[in-house]
Amino acid sequence: MNLHLFFKALVTVALLASSSACVGYDASKLNAGSGGYDKYPEFSWDHIPRYMHVWKRAAFTEEELDYLAQFPLITFEKATGVQVGSVQQGTLKAARGVKTRNPDAKILYYKNIVIDWGGSAASKELKTIEGAYLQSKDGSYPTVSRTTQFFDIGLPKVRAWWMKDARRMLDDPSIDGILIDANIKVLVDGFFLRQKKVGDEEYQRLKDGYGQLLTQIDAEFRADNIVLANIIRARLEHGGLNYLGYFDGSYLEAFEHNVGGVSRPDYIAKGIETVQAAARQGKIVAFTLGIKEALNQGNGGDFDSNEALHARVNYTAALFLIVAEKYSYFFPVDGMGVVTKGGKLANRLWMQTLPIFKKRLGAPKGPATKDGYIYTREFEHCSVWLDVENEVGTLTWR
């Protein structure tokens, strides 16, 4: 066991748990005394704070860069700019384009913790490392998306390779940090042990390597860079809070996808409690919630006439506002990719601004209150009412 990881996790859980009771609530002072916030994105309660998470194989147009420059926090996902040459080249080109328009925007480079997604300039070097790719018990190489393999961070050389690529990107002034994905695949043992048929010893080595890699990332990168992870999930015993000591915050997805026999309302309620604990300690929250199904109904992206879209956007925004604190950002998402391989628009909200982001919000007057599955919260210009059992949210603007 990685003892440094174990003890840091215990301290993190204790600190985060202590934040659940906010006496003398003041949203402007929740981060006081924590330090290290100079590297964080700009934040304002004037309107609902926005996050952007996107990829596009081709280069972004000038108009698209103008649009992206509006966001305080942006992650350029895997496949960004692969038609430019590599993910690294494409990410840097996009980041520099945004920075010329908005130097204050914070831009994150996407790094997967175990998956060697195609298009990366670093993959060539990985292939030269003996045993770099994870094998199943029968000697085969497990994959995701049919052909994409997993690298073995249980090996010191693979961890060094991972750090080298991250360091090279973080050394560029246009990159402000990294977003680390697929942590859940390492932490939920059923994925590698049962789905991918990896042996017990190999899996334990992978988990030990994960702890060692987090320690390296924390020591070498976090002083000057934002380090986010896809780490908060209600399915985990502590919701992922026991790992947040290694990160500046969490990207959130699959928030409503209940597993393990837990009811959907209870799963969402645990997620809310977990995110609140993290946000109240000044962690960055990049909250994504899907609205694809609502867009498929009615009149698509016409917010005024599509009742399903209107209801879904209000519900997801209410979920966000119930958990939000300073450095929380919201992204209602249709898709991360801008266009399909065939060149068709894949994200129907691309280059659009939903009406809720144009309304004045104002600072929260206090934390959310909870009564069963009903949550309420008051902001200067908005009253939030949320029912997670019936999945209804109401925003009353004034």
Where do the PLM segments sit?
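Bacterial N-terminal signal peptides that target proteins for export
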Residues: 1-10
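Bacterial N-terminal signal peptides
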Residues: 9-18
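Glycan-processing catalytic domains of CAZymes
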Residues: 25-398
